[in-house]
């Protein structure tokens, strides 16, 4: 296994704001979609589509617009890595 950095990855820090709706580690316990187990590519594409308005939403467009494309990439990489780290 690759050696983990002692510092917390930026994507993990940025992902903390997602937990309020999507649950800890993206495991939602409500009608809000679970993002745990989704690929980084899927999450990044969805967030970029929310940001551009290509994907309709109630609140996700506003959330996604608050992040740079690089931050969206980091968030997606973090969530995409969770299911492989925990298996």
UniProtKB/Swiss-Prot annotation:
GO CC field: periplasmic space
Post-translational modification remark: Binds 1 heme c group covalently per subunit.
Taxonomy, superkingdom: Bacteria
GO molecular function: electron transfer activity; heme binding; metal ion binding
Keywords, sorted A to Z: Electron transport, Heme, Iron, Metal-binding, Periplasm, Transport
Primary subcellular site in the record, as a coarse category: periplasm
Annotated Gene3D superfamilies: Cytochrome c-like domain
Entries under PROSITE patterns matching the protein: CYTC
Binding site for heme c: 18, 21-22, 60
Protein's cellular compartments: Periplasm
Pfam family, one: Cytochrom_C
Function as written in the Swiss-Prot or TrEMBL entry: Monoheme cytochrome that function as the electron transport subunit of sulfide dehydrogenase.
Quaternary assembly: Dimer of one cytochrome and one flavoprotein.
Protein name: Cytochrome subunit of sulfide dehydrogenase
